[in-house]
Amino acid sequence: QGTGIMVGSPGQNTDHLVEDLLFIEQFHPEMIGIGPFIPHHDTPFAACLPGSMEMTLKLLSIFRLMHPKVLLPSTTALATLAPDGRERGILAGANVVMPNLSPPEQRNKYSLYDNKASLGAEAAEGLQQLEEKLTVIGYRISKERGDY
């Protein structure tokens, strides 16, 4: 089972994040998805600021300490906030990357938020570029099952 939180949602404060930490603790999840809020132009939150990179990284680190074996993705949303966001997520404690392998001409049909990070390459090229970026920070991609 999995669960997660969006960091920096409009109206969210630190007390809410602490409540989320404690709430998630009850589930003993196998995967926890944590990513920053990023506004989409077609929503009531279009003019809102995105969530904080630093707070998202702190929460990744906290969840890693609380759940040493959990599958913890470094999200595309982190890479949308900063070019090295995905790598920073890994360094903060994430252990999963989920590259966008959709063909570039199809990606606009699935738009969760504006300016979504993409390596802009074909699926195989994008995976190779991601592997190279992670190698620079001392990690490698395993294509094995990521069982809990």
Task: Give names to the regions the model predicted.
Residues M6-D20, T76-P83:
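Active-site glycine- and acidic-residue-rich loops that bind
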Residues G4-V7, D15, G33, L71:
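Conserved mixed alpha/beta catalytic, RNA-binding, or beta-rich assembly cores of soluble enzyme
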Residues G2-Q12, P39-A46:
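Active-site-proximal beta-alpha loop/turn segments in soluble metabolic enzymes
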Residues E25-Y148:
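Auxiliary Fe-S-binding modules of radical SAM enzymes
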